[in-house]
Regions:
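Class I S-adenosyl-L-methionine
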Residues: 1-110, 115-134
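Conserved Class I SAM-dependent methyltransferase catalytic core
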Residues: 97, 121, 186-210
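Active-site loop signature of alpha/beta-hydrolase-fold enzymes
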Residues: 122, 152, 168-170
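Mobile active-site "lid"/loop adjacent to the S-adenosyl-L-methionine
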Residues: 167-189
């Protein structure tokens, strides 16, 4: 506890200076930085650095969730105390994700299958590197899936879908929009969040998206 309390919390300006100094907008440099951790930052600081280094945020419509929002959201998820095995889906995992808190939430369930999806290959690879610095419970099996969730074909249903799906509209990509509408009830929208909610509702009884 003392070690955590003594950790310096970096401001956004300080993090941006680190991003510029190490040229972390380049995903290759960011991966090396996370792996080597030359400044010996704690895991939360590494997550923050990774988020602010993500130059693809606008391209993939990905926006990351504040820690306090994630904490409050996970605390209200069903406990599944009567279950020995559950399946969880995170359909747009990004970099700052729910995984560490899900580890704590479901540490007493014997078997947890956790499928994490992201359309951005670099975000998935960076997420993996960050998780390597986190103690993953033995009861968790994590499957990383580099796919577009909206057209991805699931093999089974889930007990829980949780995450922070992308916001924004599909513009100037008619073929992509047509493929989303083809598998959706709402044919009038081009909003990604709407498509995500509709598909998530087909996959699980419990849905928690923000």
């Amino acid at each position: 506890i003392k070690k955590v309390l003594n950790q310096k919390i970096l401001s956004i300006n300080e993090i941006n200076k680190i991003v510029d100094e190490y040229n972390l907008q380049d995903s290759s440099n960011l991966k090396i930085f996370i792996k080597d951790n030359p400044c010996k930052y704690d895991i939360n600081t590494l997550y923050n650095i990774a988020e602010l280094s993500n130059i693809n945020r606008n391209e993939t419509k990905a926006y990351f969730t504040r820690e306090d929002i994630v904490f409050n959201m996970v605390s209200k998820l069903p406990a599944f105390d009567d279950r020995k095995s559950i399946k969880i889906l995170e359909p747009s995992v990004g970099i700052r994700n729910f995984l560490p808190l899900l580890f704590k939430k479901y540490k007493n369930i014997s078997n947890v299958i956790l499928d994490v999806i992201d359309i951005d290959k670099n975000s998935l690879e960076i997420s993996k590197l960050l998780l390597e610095k986190t103690k993953i419970p033995k009861n968790f099996i994590i499957n990383f899936i580099n796919e577009d969730f909206l057209i991805w074909e699931n093999e089974y249903l889930y007990d829980l879908v949780v995450g922070n799906p992308p916001y924004g509209k599909v513009i100037n990509e008619k073929n992509l929009l047509d493929s989303y509408k083809a598998i959706s009830q709402n044919k009038e929208t081009n909003n990604l969040f709407s498509f995500f909610i509709e598909k998530a509702m087909k996959l699980a009884k419990y849905i928690s998206l923000i």
